[in-house]
UniProtKB/Swiss-Prot annotation:
Compositionally biased tracts (Basic residues): 502-515, 1649-1663
Intracellular or extracellular location(s): Nucleus
Biased composition (Basic and acidic residues): 1-12, 83-117, 185-194, 419-431, 443-458, 516-526, 535-544, 1608-1627
MF terms (GO), sorted A to Z: ATP binding; ATP hydrolysis activity; ATP-dependent chromatin remodeler activity; DNA binding; histone binding
Pfam families the UniProt entry points to: DBINO (PF13892), Helicase_C (PF00271), SNF2-rel_dom (PF00176)
Name of this protein: Chromatin-remodeling ATPase INO80
Residues of the Helicase ATP-binding domain: 833-1005
GO cellular component: chromosome, centromeric region; chromosome, telomeric region; Ino80 complex
Catalysed transformations (reactions): ATP + H2O = ADP + phosphate + H(+)
Organism (species): Phaeosphaeria nodorum (strain SN15 / ATCC MYA-4574 / FGSC 10173)
Length: 1673
């Protein structure tokens, strides 16, 4: 078999190779027990085989067999590898089949670097398809390549090896010896000149095998070393295969590749191979590589003897000295090829066997699945039938019962209709009889109409009985009698429309007449009898045609036809014949189709009846089948029905008894509640009386020492002081001589028994509590500066002002104060000092502009000067007034060091280092005395402020803490301070609750438990302000007595004679057309009933009403708040120039001629080059002068020479003598284009036209003979317009021009607009000559000067050089027709229309013109910042100088803006938002205040107008308030007047004024907003609905009443002014003056105690609601 003993020895040594664990390649699969398994190579034992084939020393790395499971693409030729189950697509390869005729291939295709493809697709070790137990590779790893192969097959899907690994492994491969002669293959000659002669794939049979050499370190070479017959030749120096010789000495880095179950790229984490085997000593023993666990189960062949150790050692030593392996000998390649072919064949056999087994297993599996699924299907079908068979049977029975019921209904309906027909026929007969017996014609007509009506109803009922409704198409046909046999009558006559006798009421039909109770009962009895007969199984009575009815109908119709007036006409007359022909035509055109339709309807009805009869007959035929079960079913049904009726009866009886018992219990409970309510009312009345008495006594004791009434009555005006009431108000109880017992027992409020105690005991308890409260306040004030138990006597104790308590004289002005206080201000200082003595807090509520700031500063100066109390003082003010406080303190008291506590968090941290918390006493040299900060920052840093002990805390604009639910109010209440002073010009803004919040803040111990007290006063006083009812004078007097000791208020007119009263004017404006349209649309979208429901409901719908109010207010302000008029321009079909940065373009960017049309006309380059056009001369154009020489001269009839000759010969150009033109001029005109001729004509003077102005008589006209043909020039009327430049003659000569200008046609808007605009089509040619020619044409100086004239610089040069006037080129471009749009079609919004679109803005425009002429300066207040944006555009349009301040203005910008307005008299208007610009700023340089839209809180407007009406104002202040009449603004203004009445009544003590208030209740905000949106009638409906709802809720049982959840939402103030009035350093909103609900500590907040579930979907923040109202969302 083998031709060489070396090959036999190689085969015989195969078993030894397997025994020694040589690294042979195996397949990843094996066959064992006829079940192929595709798994990892290391999981299965090797396949047993009697004679394993010889294998080479090196292996080829192939992908695993699992890749055969992947789908293959059949679009190209496919090669299947049976040893690896891997398919590879080839471009130029044969079918992968084993063919012994092909040249043999060896597995060692990658032994040498020159034989390996440039990029091998296999990066995994080759494995045998038979015995795959482990993956290994030879110690000498084949080199890897980094280049792609250039063979005829595609690259594999495996990842290539990195170049570093490839170069590192190339040095391990040695070339064969130089003198080694191998057998040439079939294609060695063809591969000698190829750079990469071998393909990498295993089964490519078109290539010869490469020369292989044995690995000297493989076990096959070791075992065969002792039996080699021929010694190898002497080793020659190896030839270098690499260009880089440095790689030859580098040891190779072999890689073990992890075997994957699928064909995937080789992993990157490869374990390094042992490289020490190549550098072993000559006689060192070689340790075999440890095989895998699968190799341990390999059976060692028993016929092979055990090797001798000595021989092995000798062989190893011989191999190490040898330079080539056993495969380098002669004949080895041939044996290697035979071994490879046998391996391939064996692999194919294994695969074919596996394929057959796989098919059998698949068939068996599918058969088993089919049987199992069939069994499941049968079982499911059987189960479904068992489960749903009863339901199906019941459904069929229910359908039959329903059909039976429907049939019964049809029968009843049929009987009712037949009865109706009979009744109508009887009525008709009766009416006809009465008509025959009628005495007068009117009564006869009435009865005939009744007869016709009955006949129509009978006809309609008959048609309904037949199954079709009466059609309008057959109304003019005489109604027929009931034809019970079907079909229609053969005789008919045309008649008038029966429906024209009278107009129908409404859109409803006549319908059938109402039946009486007797008729309905009779029909019910008849139907019950029929049903009983059906239930018994009796046969129904047959329904026979009613012959009498049909005959009666015929008789009646005949009688009706005889009623008509007989008109006898001769049959021979033409009128009769014409009438007869017309009737025949009408019958053929109208009546015949109608009769056909009637016939068709009758036929369909008859067929339907027959079909129903057949169905009934079929059902009767099946009746005998159901008689067996019907009686039993009917009995059960009747029994069940009887049981149900009995149960319903007893349930109804029990329910009635239960309801009656509940009603009795409810009545008893209501009676008990009434008794308890009366007792509780009496108890509450005594309780409130006790609280008032206690507070009056406290106020009486404090008022004696503070002398508030005396100071408040004091004034600079003697008349006012004299007119004041002389006697002081007396308290509600007798306190004369009551000094009280200081040691009396104090009774807690909870321990009082208001039911049993008498009035004397309660009065005594009230007096004791009042004295105790006074003593407690004084003790707390004395002990404030002695927290550590210091002694009162001592020289250093200067902070206890007890010595001031008995001082009677007024204190003088402090010397530290660098100003002179007015008399009322000095009295205010004395009042504040007295409060400080008693340890009582107070409210300084002087009107805005009376110097509350300087009075507060004077108190601090007085304490520092008189008692050496230098602080610490805390001043808390709105962010807008912080700079003002700092400047005022530094100006009036320079000795007080002020810390401006604002800025970033880091800055505030530095400022807090100056605070001295260890020492109580502050001296003149302390680092600070006064801290000035804002409300927001104080609340934010409350933890630091609470650690300080403040001597005096002043709160400016104290209405910021008017809500007792806000976190601001709660935080400030916890500050440690000896005294608190509240400064506010408006102590009451909306209701009495706000006043009591301030009182509780200054005296927590006294006003702590006065919720009922506050509710009492609030209800009575506010109801008086709204309903104009009589106020309880005793309550009002007692309230004023309570407030007197704690609040001091003076008004300007009482204390300042030089400051005149401000004039307030309401300016009413009308809605414009556009505003009315918007307003009407909004009103139409509101459902009044929906609005009524929202108004009387709870407060959940308040957000919707808020949005509606905002929308209406925006309409009143300006319609552009909804939609702005945009700039319009036509669609531009062009592209514009673009630049990445304007900084690179320089200061002047030239944008002329930068637009490009999207349409480009490409011109061939040949035309643009030299010689492309014949008329353009050039070096490549030899025929350039052809056109000029021949066409322009020889062939041109307009040449001067030709025209001169023809003119002399009286030929074609003889007319030149009458045209006043020479031959040269005519030739020039002929050669010029249209533009040049127009320029020539426009620049030449028209002398012929001037003759017409001189000789304008018809009989005396001058016509020059040489210009007879110049008709246009002679008839030109242009010279007539230049005769005169003034007077009537000019107007007569320029009628068209003057009329055009006078009628405004030059400024009117065009009636049409261009839809699109585009520059000229762009000409493109890749030639520089074309570009230059375009530039010459576009920028021709002569043409440009003629069109546009010369530039200003050129004209100046001509004037300087004194050139002739003809050198100045005039502008010949005609002026645009429309002076507004000119040459462009871009339309900007009209500012004049912008002004006239709003009634307010138009009225304001006229008002500002007058104010500007009168040298006034204006403060313009707005509610909406978007309206301020629009106003800026208006002021810019009118060229008024203005400045702006709103909520978004930063703090430093705000200070500079106010300073600029105060110092710069050229600023005419100051735009401000009401909340941002209405607090604490001085704008006395303005004398006019305009409210563009008013605030619903009148105190906000009062504060805003007092920015100008304050101390320092020397001019009369006028306040204008713009109100849109007939809109929501009038109702808002009325509500603001009600709030002003509350303030006047509470503070000034006056009675109710003559203000026209309505009788509405102010119980919830939702109702008020609903009232703003409706008129008076709708308001009355809301009041009525509310009363009904209250009554229903009162009468409802306790369990039925709906629970009203108290929901706190942002009111309209917060919503409208969100983001305004906050001047934080970071330019962020700091919270509105009224704390917005939802903040920390507010009820209903998400993080509070009650806000567990958070906000609902309807609940939105104020900012979100404002965005919705503005239309931004």
């Amino acid at each position: 078999m083998f031709r060489d003993p070396v090959l036999r020895r190689s085969v015989d040594g195969e078993g030894e190779t397997m025994q020694q664990g040589d690294h042979q390649a195996h397949s990843p699969t094996q066959t064992q027990g006829h079940q192929p398994r595709i798994h990892s190579a290391t999981n299965y034992p090797p396949h047993q085989q009697s004679r394993p084939p010889p294998s080479p020393s090196h292996t080829t790395e192939l992908p695993p067999i699992s890749t055969a499971l992947h789908s293959r693409d059949t679009s190209a030729s496919k090669y299947y590898d049976p040893t690896s189950d891997h398919g590879e697509r080839g471009l130029a390869r044969d079918t992968a089949r084993y063919d012994p005729q092909h040249s043999p291939q060896t597995r060692e295709t990658h032994t040498y670097s020159d034989a390996r493809p440039a990029h091998s697709p296999y990066e995994k070790p080759y494995q045998s398809p038979i015995a795959s137990s482990y993956a290994h590779q030879s110690p000498l790893q084949r080199p890897l390549s980094q280049h792609h192969h250039t063979g005829g097959m595609e690259a594999m899907s495996h990842s290539p090896v990195s170049p570093s690994v490839y170069h590192a492994n190339r040095g391990a491969v040695q070339p064969p010896p130089a003198n080694y002669a191998r057998r040439p293959s079939m294609k060695d000659e063809a591969r000698e000149n190829r750079p990469f002669p071998l393909q990498h794939h295993l089964l490519t049979v078109t290539q010869a095998p490469p020369p292989t050499r044995a690995d000297p370190m493989s076990l096959s070479s070791i075992m065969s070393a002792g039996t080699d017959s021929d010694p190898p030749a002497k080793a020659q120096p190896p030839a270098s295969l690499n260009h880089d010789h440095g790689h030859l000495s580098k040891p190779p880095n072999a890689h073990f590749v992890k075997q994957e179950p699928m064909a995937s790229p080789a992993p990157a984490d490869l374990a390094p191979h042992d490289n020490g085997i190549l550098h072993r000593a000559p006689y060192d023993p070689i340790h075999p590589v440890a095989p895998s666990h699968a190799l341990q189960s390999f059976a060692t062949p028993r016929d092979l003897p055990a090797p001798d150790e000595a021989e092995i050692e000798a062989a190893l030593a011989h191999i190490e000295t040898k330079q080539m392996n056993d495969l380098d000998g002669p004949g080895a390649p041939f044996e290697h090829e035979e071994w490879r072919e046998r391996s391939l064949k064996r692999g194919l056999d294994v695969i074919s066997g596996e394929t057959v087994k796989r098919k059998k297993r698949r068939h068996a599996t599918l058969t088993r699945y089919h049987d199992v699924l069939a069994a499941h299907r049968d079982y499911a079908k059987h189960s479904y039938n068992l489960e749903h068979e009863g339901d199906a049977w019941q459904q069929v029975q229910s359908q039959e019962i329903a059909e039976e019921k429907e049939r019964k209904k049809d029968m009843q309906r049929k009987r009712r209709r037949e009865k109706t027909i009979q009744n109508e026929e009887a009525k008709r007969a009766e009416a006809l009889a009465k008509a025959g017996q009628a005495d007068n014609e009117e009564e006869k007509e009435r009865h005939l109409a009744a007869a016709q009506k009955a006949e129509r109803k009978a006809k309609n009922t008959s048609q309904l009985l037949q199954g079709n409704a009466p059609s309008k198409d057959i109304r003019e046909v005489t109604p027929h009698g009931p034809n019970l046999e079907g079909g229609t009558m053969s005789s008919f006559q045309a008649s008038d429309d029966l429906g024209t006798g009278g107009k129908r009421k409404g859109n409803r039909g006549t319908g059938r007449l109402k039946k009486s109770k007797e008729q309905k009962q009779a029909e019910k009895d008849a139907a019950a009898a029929g049903q009983a007969a059906i239930d018994r199984g009796d046969d129904l009575p047959s329904i026979a045609p009613r012959e009498e009815a049909r005959l009666g109908s015929l008789r009646d119709r005949s009688y009706t036809e005889e009623l008509g007036n007989g008109f006898v006409t001769s049959h021979d007359s033409s009128a009769y014949r014409n009438l007869y022909a017309q009737i025949i035509k009408d019958l053929a055109r109208k009546d015949v189709p109608k009769v056909v339709r009637i016939k068709e309807n009758s036929l369909s009805t008859k067929q339907s009846n027959l079909r129903k009869t057949a169905q009934l007959a079929a059902k009767e035929a099946r009746r005998w089948q159901m008689r067996t079960n019907k009686n039993q079913k009917d009995t059960q049904a009747r029994a069940k029905r009887g049981m149900r009726e009995m149960l319903a009866f007893w349930k109804r009886n029990e329910r009635d008894e239960r309801e009656s018992r509940k009603n009795a219990e409810r009545q008893e409970l209501e009676n008990a509640k009434k008794v308890e309510a009366e007792r509780e009312a009496n108890r509450q009345k005594r309780k409130l009386n006790f609280l008032i008495s206690q507070t009056e006594l406290y106020s009486h004791f404090i008022g004696k020492k503070a002398r508030t009434a005396e100071i408040e009555r004091s004034t600079d005006d003697a008349e006012t002081a004299a007119s004041a009431p002389a006697e002081a108000e007396k308290p509600g109880i007798d306190v004369d001589g009551m000094d009280g017992n200081p040691t009396a027992k104090v009774t807690n409020f909870e321990d009082l028994d208001f039911d049993n105690d008498d009035e004397s005991a309660l009065n005594a308890a009230a007096m004791a509590n009042a004295q105790h409260a006074i003593q407690e306040a004084q003790d707390r004030a004395r002990a404030f500066n002695n927290p550590e138990g210091q002694e009162d006597d001592g020289e250093l104790n200067f902070q206890n002002p007890s010595g001031l308590q008995n001082k009677e004289d007024w204190i003088p002005q402090p010397k530290l104060l660098n100003c002179t206080l007015k008399e009322y201000q000095l009295k205010g200082l004395n009042w504040l000092v007295n409060l400080y003595e008693q340890g009582i807090n107070g409210i300084l509520a002087d009107e805005m502009g009376l110097g509350k700031t300087v009075q507060s500063i004077s108190v601090m100066a007085y304490l520092a000067e008189r008692y050496n109390i230098w602080g610490p003082f805390l001043v808390i003010a709105p962010a807008s007034t912080l700079h003002n406080w700092q400047q005022e303190i530094a100006k009036f008291v320079p000795d007080l060091n002020v810390i401006p506590y604002w800025g970033t968090a880091k800055d505030r941290k530095v400022l807090r280092k100056l605070w001295d918390r260890k020492h109580v006493t502050y001296t003149r040299d302390s680092p600070f005395h006064v801290v000035v900060s804002s409300y927001q920052l104080v609340v934010q840093d409350a933890q630091y402020f609470q650690k300080m002990r403040w001597q005096y805390m002043i709160l400016d604009e104290a209405q910021a803490i008017k809500s007792s639910n806000s976190s601001r109010w709660k935080s400030l209440l916890n500050f440690h301070s000896r005294n608190r002073l509240l400064l506010t010009g408006t102590p009451i803004q909306n209701n009495m609750q706000e006043l009591w919040a301030l009182l509780h803040f200054i005296m927590p111990s006294l006003f702590d438990s006065h919720d009922e007290f506050s509710e009492w006063f609030s209800k009575d006083i506010e109801s008086h302000a709204q309903s104009n009812t009589k106020l309880n004078e005793d309550q009002l007097r007692r309230l004023h007595m309570i407030l007197k000791p704690f609040m001091l208020r003076r008004v300007k007119k009482h204390v300042q004679k030089e400051l005149g009263d401000k004039i307030e004017l309401d300016v009413y404006c009308d809605l414009t057309y556009r505003q009315r349209a918007y307003y009407a649309n909004l009103r139409n979208k509101i459902s009044i009933m929906d609005l009524i429901e929202k108004a009387v409901g709870d407060e959940q719908d308040s957000a919707t009403l808020m949005n509606l109010v905002m929308q209406f207010r925006k309409v009143c302000n300006h319609p552009d708040l909804f939609e702005r008029a945009d700039t319009w321009s036509p669609f531009t079909f062009a592209s514009f120039a673009e630049t990445p940065s304007f900084l690179r373009e320089g200061q002047n960017v030239r944008v002329a001629y930068t637009t490009r049309n999207f349409i480009e006309y490409s011109l061939p380059r040949l035309i643009g080059r030299n010689g492309g056009r014949l008329e353009i001369a050039g070096p490549d154009n030899e025929k350039a002068g052809f056109r000029g020489h021949y066409l322009d001269n020889l062939f041109n009839i307009w040449s001067p020479h030709n025209m001169e000759q023809s003119a002399r010969e009286a030929d074609a150009h003889s007319w030149l003598r009458f045209s006043d033109l020479s031959a040269t001029e005519v030739s020039k005109i002929a050669k010029s284009d249209l533009f040049e001729r127009a320029l020539e004509t426009g620049s030449s003077p028209n002398k012929l036209g001037q003759y017409e102005t001189l000789y304008d008589d018809e009989n005396d006209k001058y016509e020059p003979k040489h210009s007879m043909l110049r008709i246009i020039d002679r008839k030109d009327r242009a010279p007539l317009t230049d005769l005169t430049s003034e007077g009537y003659m000019r107007n007569l000569m320029n009628v068209s021009q003057s009329a055009f200008e006078r009628t405004g046609l030059d400024v009117i808007e065009p009636c049409a607009k261009p839809a699109a605009a585009a520059p000229p089509v762009e000409l493109y040619c890749a030639s520089q000559d074309v570009i230059a020619e375009k530039q010459r044409v576009f920028f021709n100086p002569a043409i440009r000067n003629a069109l546009y004239g010369v530039s200003d610089k050129t004209e100046q040069v001509l004037l300087d050089t004194k050139s002739h006037s003809t050198a100045l080129v005039r502008n010949t471009l005609p002026s645009p027709t429309n002076a507004r749009t000119r040459y462009t079609h871009i339309e900007a919004p009209s500012m004049s229309r912008f002004v006239t679109d709003s009634g307010k803005l138009a009225r304001l425009d006229a008002l500002l013109k007058g104010l500007k002429a009168g040298d006034h300066r204006v403060l313009l207040y707005f509610q909406m910042t978007r309206m301020i944006d629009l106003m800026e555009e208006y002021l810019t349009y009118r060229n008024y100088k203005y400045c702006r301040l709103d909520g978004s203005t930063k703090l430093e910008d705000r200070r500079d803006t106010v300073a600029d307005f105060q110092s710069d008299p050229t600023i005419f208007v100051f735009l401000l938002s009401t909340r941002a610009g209405g607090l604490g700023i001085n704008l006395t340089s303005a004398d006019t205040v305009i409210f563009y839209d008013s605030d619903w809180n009148p105190t906000i407007d009062s504060q805003a107008m007092d920015r100008a009406h304050r101390l320092g104002q020397t001019r009369q202040v006028t306040v204008y308030r713009l109100i849109t009449s007939g809109t929501i603004e009038e109702r808002i203004r009325k509500r603001a007047l009600q709030k002003e009445e509350v303030q006047r009544v509470v503070i000034s003590g006056g009675a109710g004024g003559a203000v026209d208030f309505n009788t509405r209740s102010r119980e919830n905000r939702t109702k008020d907003m609903a009232m703003w949106l409706v008129d008076d009638e709708q308001a009355a409906e809301i009041e009525k609905k509310e009363a009904e709802l209250a009554e229903a809720e009162k009468n409802a049982p306790p369990g039925k009443k709906r629970s009203k959840k108290k929901r706190v939402e942002a009111n309209l103030d917060d919503m409208y002014h969100e983001g305004e009035g906050h001047f934080d350093e970071s330019a962020k909103g700091s919270g509105a003056a009224t704390p917005v609900p939802g903040t920390e500590g507010a009820p209903g907040a998400p993080g509070g105690k009650k806000g567990k579930k958070g906000l609902s979907k309807k609940a939105k923040t104020a900012k979100q609601r404002l965005a919705v109202a503005d239309g931004e969302v």
